[in-house]
């Protein structure tokens, strides 16, 4: 995975979930917050991050910084994905299918946020297995990293793009 410099990108961030986490100690309970954030430029770059802190804004800030370190490049064909793929992480699986232009994003929750910030306008998805936000996000990112354009597949097979499409 190649590093993508976030300073040259106009990134937006979206908070997917904020969890209240407690640690029980001898003196009582210690309260902290865990945040999951997705960042993207709506032009083929997207990443996610997690952060924990004693205050919500600090947890979100840490998550955004983490997300900027984990950016990936998403191949696009027009407004949709190049091909169908299943992303996996843990017990979570996400099926991502290209859709006809104008059909919109048929996805729920975390998958929708990832697709919107990646700049994918037309896609259909189905979440299979674990529906936990972090597992769904990681499975979606896994699916997007498995995406290959027709040019990349033709290069791997040492054939031309025209013969691949026939």
Curated annotation (Swiss-Prot):
GO molecular function list? rRNA binding; structural constituent of ribosome
Domain (S5 DRBM): give its ranges.
11-74
One of the record's GO cellular component terms: small ribosomal subunit
Per the UniProt entry, what are the Gene Ontology biological process annotations, in alphabetical order? Answer: translation
Which keywords describe this protein according to UniProt?
Ribonucleoprotein, Ribosomal protein, RNA-binding, rRNA-binding
Question: Which family does the entry's similarity section mention?
Answer: Belongs to the universal ribosomal protein uS5 family.
Q: Which HAMAP family match?
A: Ribosomal_uS5_B
Q: What is known of its domains?
A: The N-terminal domain interacts with the head of the 30S subunit; the C-terminal domain interacts with the body and contacts protein S4. The interaction surface between S4 and S5 is involved in control of translational fidelity.
Q: What does this protein do?
A: With S4 and S12 plays an important role in translational accuracy.
| UniProt protein name | Small ribosomal subunit protein uS5
Q: Which organism is it from?
A: Latilactobacillus sakei subsp. sakei (strain 23K)
Its lineage opens with: Bacteria, Bacillati, Bacillota, Bacilli, Lactobacillales
């Amino acid at each position: 995975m190649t590093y993508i410099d976030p300073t040259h990108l106009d990134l937006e961030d979206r908070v997917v979930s904020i969890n209240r986490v407690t640690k029980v100690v001898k003196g009582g309970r210690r309260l902290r917050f865990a945040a999951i954030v997705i960042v993207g430029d709506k032009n083929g770059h997207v990443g996610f991050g997690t952060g924990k802190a004693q205050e919500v804004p600090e947890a979100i800030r840490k998550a955004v910084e983490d997300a900027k370190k984990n950016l990936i490049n998403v191949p696009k064909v027009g407004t949709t994905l190049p091909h169908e793929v299943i992303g996996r992480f843990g017990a979570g699986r996400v099926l991502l299918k290209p859709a006809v232009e104008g059909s919109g994003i048929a996805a729920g929750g975390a998958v929708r946020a990832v697709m919107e910030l990646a700049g994918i306008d037309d896609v259909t998805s189905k979440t299979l297995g674990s529906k936990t936000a972090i597992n769904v996000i990681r499975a979606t990112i896994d699916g997007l990293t498995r995406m290959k354009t027709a040019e990349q597949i033709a290069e791997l097979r040492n054939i031309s793009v025209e013969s691949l499409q026939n």
